[in-house]
C-alpha cells in the first residue's frame, strides 16, 4: 500500500527486493559479474563480494577491510564442508535453507562462524523441536559450545522434566560432577527422590575410582526426607559404598532419624537440608473417594481436582462399594480402610484395606486390619496409620484403636480411647492425636477432647463446653487444628499449645457428613449435607475454600455431583509422571 505525503505519495514495491535477490542468484549461477570464488577444498562457487558483504558482518569485515581476502580471487573457508558452504551461499542469495537432522549441526556451526543469526536461530528452533530424553543432555553441551541460550534453556528443561528417562541414558554417566550436581539440586527436577538417588549411584559407579570423592556433595542434593521409608531401609541405609564414607554415614544417620523416628529429628539435627520442601514439580491435588452420590447408593467413584486447571478427572473406581469406610494418604498412596461392603442384598462390616497408586491409577489389596469396623476415623503420623473406634461386627460402639506400620506392613493394637464415640473430628499435631467431640451410642453430642500421646501409647481427656461437633472433619492448618462444622456453621481453630479455641468465619450453611482437606495453606470443604432454614436436610455439591489469612470463604464452584459421607484428601504428585499425563 502506498504511503500518502502532503505533496504526493511514496510508492512501495514490496516484491522488488525479493525479485532483485532472485536476479542476483541467476547472475551467480551464470557466473556473470562474479568477482570472488568461495572455496572448500577443491570445491568452489563463484559469488559477488558486494552480496556477501551485505549479508553478514563476517564477510563485510573480510571484503571491506585490508585483509588479503579482499583482493584474492579465491577464498578458502576452513572448517566448513562444501555441502554446508553451498547451503549458506544458497541462503544468502535466496533467503532459504533446508534444515534436517543430517545437516543441522554443521549448518548451525557455520551460521555461528559466518554470523548469520537467523539461520542460527532456525537451527536452534529445529533442534528444540527434536528434543527428547535421549538427546537433551548432548544438546545442552552443544548449546554451551555454540553459546545458544534458547536451546540450552529448552534442552535443560526437557532433561529436568523427563529426568527418570534421562537418568537411564548413557549421556548422564558422562556428565562431570558439577553438571550432575546442578541437575540433582535443581528444584524443577521432575522425579521421585528414589530416582534421583539411583541416578547418583549409577553415575558414581560408572567410574568409581575417580568419582567416589564427589559422593558426599552429590548425596546432599537428594532430598532424602521424601524417600519412601521402605526404599531407604532396603536400598540406602546399609549401602556398602555410602557406608565407606564417614561424611555420607553422617548424612544417612540424620535421614534415618527424620524418616523413622516417631518424634522426628531434634532441633540440633534439623539442619537446613531437612527443612527443604518437596521439589516444585510436585503439585497438590484434591481427591474425593466413595460416599453417597446424588442421594443414591454408595458410589465407587474416585474424583481428582487440580487447583491449577480447575478441572475434575475420574480415576480408577474403588474395587467394591464401601459404606462409611475411612481413607488417608501416606507416602504418595491412598489407603481405604474398613467400611461396610454393599452388594446385592448383603452388607458385611469389613476389615479390608485397599491401596491406590495415582502413578499407576490402580488399586491393590493391602494388609487387613485386626478388627472389622465402619463409621470409624483414621489418620496418619509419620510412617503409621491409626484406625480409631467406629462400629464393630456386632453393631457395638468400638473404643479400640489399631496402628499400621507401613515399614513392616503389620497392624498392631494400641491403647483404646477413654470414651467410645462415633463421628468425632480427628487430627494429629505435635506427636499427639486429637479426637474432638462426636456422639455416644444414644446419638448425644460428647463434649470432650480426647488426646492420645503417640510415643507413650497413652490417652487423656479434657471436658470443654466449646465442643459439640458431630460428623465433622478436622484439619491441621498452620499451627492450629481447625474443626469444620458438624451440624453447625461454626469453624473452630484449636491451638494445642495454649489449649484455646478461636472462632473463625462461619460457613454459609450448617453442614455435616462433608469432607475437608488443606491445599496450599487453605482449607477446602466439599459436599456433605446441609440443614435448611426450615430444618430440612439437603445433599450438597458445594465446594468452598477458606483463607486463614483473610478469614474469608470463597466458592470454588460445584462438585461434579452431590456427595456426602465421602473421603476428601490431598495427594501430592508430579502430574506428568502419573495417570494424569
Curated annotation (Swiss-Prot):
Key word Calcium present: no
Designated name of the protein: Kelch-like protein 38
Record's keyword annotation contains Repeat: yes
Kelch repeats: 285-332, 334-383, 384-431, 433-479, 480-521, 523-573
Gene: Klhl38
CDD domains for this protein: BACK_KLHL38 (cd18476)
Pfam families xref list: BACK (PF07707), Beta-prop_ATRN-LZTR1 (PF24981), BTB (PF00651)
Keyword annotations: Kelch repeat, Repeat
InterPro entries named among the record's database cross-references: BACK, Beta-prop_ATRN-MKLN-like, BTB-kelch_protein, BTB/POZ_dom, Kelch-typ_b-propeller, Kelch_1, KLHL38_BACK, SKP1/BTB/POZ_sf
Domain BACK intervals: 136-237
The BTB domain, residue ranges: 34-101
The organism's place on the tree of life at top rank: Eukaryota
Amino acid at each position: 500500500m502506498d504511503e500518502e505525503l502532503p505533496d504526493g505519495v511514496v510508492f512501495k514495491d514490496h516484491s522488488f527486493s525479493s525479485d532483485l535477490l532472485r536476479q542476483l542468484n541467476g547472475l551467480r549461477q551464470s557466473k556473470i559479474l562474479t568477482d570472488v570464488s568461495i572455496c572448500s577444498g577443491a570445491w568452489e562457487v563463484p559469488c559477488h563480494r558486494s552480496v556477501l558483504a551485505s549479508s553478514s558482518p563476517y564477510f563485510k569485515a573480510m571484503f571491506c577491510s585490508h585483509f588479503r581476502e579482499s583482493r584474492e580471487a579465491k577464498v578458502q573457508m576452513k572448517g566448513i564442508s562444501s555441502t554446508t558452504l553451498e547451503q549458506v551461499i544458497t541462503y544468502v542469495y535466496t533467503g532459504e535453507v533446508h534444515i534436517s537432522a543430517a545437516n543441522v549441526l554443521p549448518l548451525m556451526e557455520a551460521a555461528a562462524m559466518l554470523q548469520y543469526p537467523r539461520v542460527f536461530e532456525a537451527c536452534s528452533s529445529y533442534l528444540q523441536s527434536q528434543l527428547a530424553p535421549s538427546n537433551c543432555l548432548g544438546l545442552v553441551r552443544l548449546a554451551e559450545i555454540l553459546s545458544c541460550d534458547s536451546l540450552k534453556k529448552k534442552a535443560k528443561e526437557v532433561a529436568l522434566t523427563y529426568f527418570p528417562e534421562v537418568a537411564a541414558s548413557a549421556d548422564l554417566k558422562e556428565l562431570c560432577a558439577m553438571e550432575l550436581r546442578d541437575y540433582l539440586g535443581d528444584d524443577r527436577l521432575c522425579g521421585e527422590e528414589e530416582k534421583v538417588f539411583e541416578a547418583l549411584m549409577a553415575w558414581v559407579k560408572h567410574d568409581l575410582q575417580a568419582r567416589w570423592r564427589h559422593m558426599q556433595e552429590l548425596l546432599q542434593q537428594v532430598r532424602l526426607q521424601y524417600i519412601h521409608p521402605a526404599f531407604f531401609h532396603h536400598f540406602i541405609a546399609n549401602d556398602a559404598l555410602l557406608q565407606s564414607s564417614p561424611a555420607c554415614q553422617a548424612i544417612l544417620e540424620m535421614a534415618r532419624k527424620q524418616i523413622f523416628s516417631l518424634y522426628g529429628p531434634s532441633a540440633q539435627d534439623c539442619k537446613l537440608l531437612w527443612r527443604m520442601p518437596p521439589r516444585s514439580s510436585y503439585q497438590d491435588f484434591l481427591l474425593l473417594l466413595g460416599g453417597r452420590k446424588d442421594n443414591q447408593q454408595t458410589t465407587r467413584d474416585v474424583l481428582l481436582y487440580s487447583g491449577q486447571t480447575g478441572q475434575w478427572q475420574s480415576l480408577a473406581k474403588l474395587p467394591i462399594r464401601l459404606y462409611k469406610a475411612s481413607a488417608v494418604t501416606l507416602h504418595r498412596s491412598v489407603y481405604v480402610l474398613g467400611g461396610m461392603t454393599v452388594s446385592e442384598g448383603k452388607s458385611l462390616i469389613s476389615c479390608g484395606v485397599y491401596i491406590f497408586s495415582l502413578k499407576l491409577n490402580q488399586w491393590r489389596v493391602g494388609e487387613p486390619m485386626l478388627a472389622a469396623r465402619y463409621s470409624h476415623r483414621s489418620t496418619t503420623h509419620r510412617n503409621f496409620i491409626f484406625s480409631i473406634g467406629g462400629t464393630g461386627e456386632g453393631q457395638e460402639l468400638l473404643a479400640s484403636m489399631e496402628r499400621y506400620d507401613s515399614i513392616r506392613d503389620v497392624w498392631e493394637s494400641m491403647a483404646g480411647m477413654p470414651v467410645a464415640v462415633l463421628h468425632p473430628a480427628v487430627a494429629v499435631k505435635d506427636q499427639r492425636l486429637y479426637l474432638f467431640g462426636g456422639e455416644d451410642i444414644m446419638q448425644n453430642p460428647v463434649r470432650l477432647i480426647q488426646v492420645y500421646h503417640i510415643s507413650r501409647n497413652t490417652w487423656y481427656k479434657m471436658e470443654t463446653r466449646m465442643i459439640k461437633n458431630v460428623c465433622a472433619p478436622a484439619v491441621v492448618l498452620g499451627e492450629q487444628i481447625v474443626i469444620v462444622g458438624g451440624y453447625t456453621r461454626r469453624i473452630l481453630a484449636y491451638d494445642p499449645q495454649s489449649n484455646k479455641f478461636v472462632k473463625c468465619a462461619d460457613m454459609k450453611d450448617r453442614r455435616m457428613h462433608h469432607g475437608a482437606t488443606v491445599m496450599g495453606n487453605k482449607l477446602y470443604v466439599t459436599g456433605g449435607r446441609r440443614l435448611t432454614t426450615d430444618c430440612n436436610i439437603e445433599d450438597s455439591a458445594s465446594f468452598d475454600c477458606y483463607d486463614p489469612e483473610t478469614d474469608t470463604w470463597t466458592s470454588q464452584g460445584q462438585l461434579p455431583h452431590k456427595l456426602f459421607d465421602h473421603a476428601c484428601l490431598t495427594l501430592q504428585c508430579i502430574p506428568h509422571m502419573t495417570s494424569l499425563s
